[in-house]
Amino acid sequence: MEFSVKSGSPEKQRSACIVVGVFEPRRLSPIAEQLDKISDGYISALLRRGELEGKPGQTLLLHHVPNVLSERILLIGCGKERELDERQYKQVIQKTINTLNDTGSMEAVCFLTELHVKGRNNYWKVRQAVETAKETLYSFDQLKTNKSEPRRPLRKMVFNVPTRRELTSGERAILHGLAIAAAIKAAKDLGNMPPNICNAAYLASQARQLADSYSKNVITRVIGEQQMKELGMHSYLAVGQGSQNESLMSVIEYKGNASEDARPIVLVGKGLTFDSGGISIKPSEGMDEMKYDMCGAAAVYGVMRMVAELQLPINVIGVLAGCENMPGGRAYRPGDVLTTMSGQTVEVLNTDAEGRLVLCDVLTYVERFEPEAVIDVATLTGACVIALGHHITGLMANHNPLAHELIAASEQSGDRAWRLPLGDEYQEQLESNFADMANIGGRPGGAITAGCFLSRFTRKYNWAHLDIAGTAWRSGKAKGATGRPVALLAQFLLNRAGFNGEE
């Protein structure tokens, strides 16, 4: 789908469709008022007859409106003007895209960017419209034999901005929006792949392809089990030893700043391509969704794609920690004591608390990059779902400025996160009689004790942890990967690169 931006009055638009907003109760937006004036009150007369109230989600498609060059006008209900916020704006865009796609409008000029969203500028409105449009049109049908497509799908969308001064920021918004949307799609595609296809080797192949596509700035190295053994990554290796699929760690390095003192930002993604729970096996109900236990790695992959596509002037390293947790004669057991790459020992009390055992070795491994900051992304704990539900990602950090940056990026992008504490009191729950620590700390504060466990391996750099167990995928009828927190991380990196969304 093609996007562009221009500045022009509605009466001069010659398009298949013009999209404008209507507020409750039956109040036209400024552009809709202009069209009403041109058409000698045609639109307002329809509203007076009760054709459209302006409630959120309502639509009215008008054909051959008098004195208007475009074939059709789509009126979209936007609710009460004062109540229009970021969430409702995205819902209005989503409804617009679905209606245009369903009614065969192959192209449209959208004036919804005129809507006032408190604290948001035209760059934000255009970029969010692009991201929302791509999200709305997303489908995962690679493995279906019968693919259903609209007869006349929407192919072109033009966003109107008030004056020519906003054209540059509008074009940048489209550029950024398309790159982020492609990153989200890449993460969702990886997450939705079945575990018999998407294993650690598949993740590694995707990482290599990324380096092939962006060879100017990206190199990929894949570290196998033999090299992990030589590095002392015994905790990571233990998790995968019950599987026939080799554990592989893919390291994607993007260099956008050649300065010698430009330290990299490191992103670490948990990549459990299937998590049965191991010997501490999970219940069978919903176990199919454990293919989503690699959504952290999928998100990191997507973000690395976005960074390379936009050629951001920063250095970023993405690590995909590929692994599979299976029961079997070679599987690790409750009661085992593992020696991590850091030299610290861990008593395994539950083999289903495996993500932290993989991540702890990767967090030690990335010390060699002397990072500016390290952010790990993981579907880590069911406890985080209990704490925050499915709407907000859990955030923990050992560095307040980094945490504040991530929270700000989450608010800017609409991909929200909430900070949880990392108090010393919680560390006591990880005490073990037989090792330096246990891999679980009991039910109370389970998301926090998991973060506390990881914090013991991050003392040499600024670190943040994103627990996406509640936000990485949806269950039920709309089952599928969400691509989160790609938008959050993308905004964080755009901010670091100096693109903070100002006009």
Curated annotation (Swiss-Prot):
Any one GO CC term of the record: cytoplasm
Free-text remark on how the cofactor is bound: Binds 2 manganese ions per subunit.
Names of the cofactor(s): Mn(2+)
Positions that bind Mn(2+) 2: 270, 275, 293, 354
Enzyme class, UniProt record, top EC level: hydrolase
Keyword annotations of the record: Aminopeptidase, Cytoplasm, Hydrolase, Manganese, Metal-binding, Protease
InterPro entries: Leucine_aapep/pepB (IPR011356), Macro_dom-like (IPR043472), Peptidase_M17_C (IPR000819), Peptidase_M17_leu_NH2_pept (IPR023042), Peptidase_M17_N (IPR008283)
PROSITE patterns: CYTOSOL_AP
Residues involved in Mn(2+) 1 binding: 275, 352, 354
Annotated localization: Cytoplasm
Task of the protein: Presumably involved in the processing and regular turnover of intracellular proteins. Catalyzes the removal of unsubstituted N-terminal amino acids from various peptides.
Homology family: Belongs to the peptidase M17 family.
NCBIfam families from the UniProt entry: PRK00913.1-1, PRK00913.1-2, PRK00913.1-4
Protein name per the record: Probable cytosol aminopeptidase
Taxonomic lineage of the native organism: Bacteria, Pseudomonadati, Pseudomonadota, Gammaproteobacteria, Enterobacterales
